[in-house]
Amino acid sequence: MNLRSILPVLCTLFPLLTFAQERDSVIHSAYGQDSVSCMMEVSVYARRSEEIVPSQRLSGKRLESLSSFSVADAMRYFSGVQIKDYGGVGGLKTIDIRSMGTNHMGVFYDGIQLGNAQNGLVDLGRFSLDNVEEIALYNGQKAQIFQPARDYGTSGSVYIRTRRPRFEEGKNHNLRASLKGGSFDLINPSLTWEQRWSKRISSSLSADYTGASGKYRFRYRRVLPSGQVAWDTTAVRQNGDIRSFRVEASVFGNTQDGTWNAKAYYYDSERGIPGAIVNNVWKHSQRQWDRNFFAQGQWTKHVSDRYKFQVSGKYANDWMRYLNPDTTLMYQDNKFRQNELYLSTAHHVELLPGWQMNLAADYQYNTLDASLTNFVFPVRHTLLLALATQYEYRRLRLMASLLGTNVWDRTTKGITSDPVSNATSRWTPAVYVSYQPLKDCSDLSLRAFYKGIFRLPTFNDLYYTEVGNASLQPETTRQWNLGFIYSHDWYRGLFRHVEVKADGYFNMVDNKIVAIPKGSGQYRWMMMNVGKVHIAGVEAMAEAVMRWRRDWSLVLCLNYTYQSATDRTAPTDNDPYYGTYGGQIAYIPWHSGSVAGNLSWRNLGLNYSFIYVGERYHTSANIRENYEQPWYTHDLSATYRWQLPRLALTFALECNNLFNQQYDVIHNYPMPGRNWKGSVKVEW
């Protein structure tokens, strides 16, 4: 699928257009058309019903104020999140919540999950913040029960909500253009056009291009167990270039008794894979090409005050080529193509005042084609059934769900062999409770939850040539959480809003899917269910909003995480030097945290952020050779907005890693030192 074949689809979809405004500073009716009116500024901090579920979010000006280029960069400021970052603008960036594993994360883009049946990974580095309005992180699942069945099926969820058109009174279109540039030869132009076609229909068309050489200087230093310095040199990171193009068209509509929306998305990239710095090899030659397309839509109808339903659908086509031209290792030129079809219906009923119920059914169809020898061309059918209920009585709120997962895989072994089928069927529960202990004070809430869920082996886990294992069982997780949230608002004085929340948790991961040596040699590997992990941790967050002299405001946010994530696979594997039993699992720090501050005066903004990741090991054998030092970065940025009669200009300058800290997130993948970005944005 190339760009030329995608553009007609976008052009066909674009005139079908609509939008329903959400929250923030816009006042609207339930199904009315959006408009923005100028009025005296008032700060409102509404209590979110979702707080029965531990959640974190970044949105609006606070999201813009962070020195972040992609969704992955912004999520570094969430507690309990580990970012696997291989460095540079084009490096792969995935996330892990509460040490349960990247594949247990669900990433939802405008309400529908992004899938990858091949390896289960979603590269959050490819989602620019230019078109993102809010990023929300939930432990377990969203608190609202009116949602598709697939939303109940992950251990943690990230919801990315793109920008919605907002129109000033008497205005029917918005145009926004921006240009970013900076270190690593970065160039990033973007353009967004928003149009109101009628009272009930509006649209958005957004596109951007990213180009960078990915070259940056780094210091490579390694010390032997004896204390002798083995390496200490400075080099330039090579083969980290990227060229990518993204375009998406969205249409939004309001009806008399509901809403609908549709979206088409296309992403095309070519990038180098810089590789690890090992064996005195400083430059690699591997390349990767990606083409991702999906079209999705949702329709919600309120039949009565007590009954509403939602229908969702999606088609996705993903193509990837991996090239390793180095014949001294093994020449590879592999191509993969995935197809996904997804349909969902959800039905919400209010049985009695305070008692609600939701029934959802989803169907998903996945295929994978590959150019590998003896590949089995798997096909997967997934049927999900979810029943959820929510009950509120005075200061008590309960929510429970039961998810049924039925999966059928079908493969063809070679060209002439008979098909082989495999089936999985399981039911998994979740229970959430929230209670306000003080009768006359709604500022304090206690919360707790339990959730059991599993993740299916990916197509690579099951069927990758010579490595896959078709007998794999699902990898299961069980989560327990206990916490509180305190939130208070003031309408006068220095402090306008204070929020403190903390959660303690314990997670168990069983049947963990890992690669182990196959046979008598160590050069062949197979995926097996042999892993077990116990995770105990604490997350804490504090936020304060201050305002004085009308023009000045200050927002401060602190996050802290403690985690003990230990390998509990084999009690006999307790050798003091090579053993992994009881060791902290790879790349999970005991301590981590962040500080972010935003100081505003009229049209000027000054933003500071600090991120700290404590000591950790790059394998579960916690010995000196595997030790990774703590790292931290300071980021600083300044913005100025110049308002003119018909347009607004915003200038920004940011410095990341201000003190030039040399560090690795992943062992032997050096990260950039001090780097700069500048941008200008025009809105009219």
Give residue ranges: language-model regions:
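N-terminal periplasmic "start-of-domain" segments of outer-membrane beta-barrel proteins
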Residues: 36-66
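Extracytoplasmic beta-strand/coil segments of soluble accessory domains associated
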Residues: 76-116
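A beta-strand signature from Gram-negative outer-membrane beta-barrel systems
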Residues: 129-176
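Conserved C-terminal beta-signal and adjacent last beta-strands/turns
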Residues: 194, 206, 252, 389-390, ...
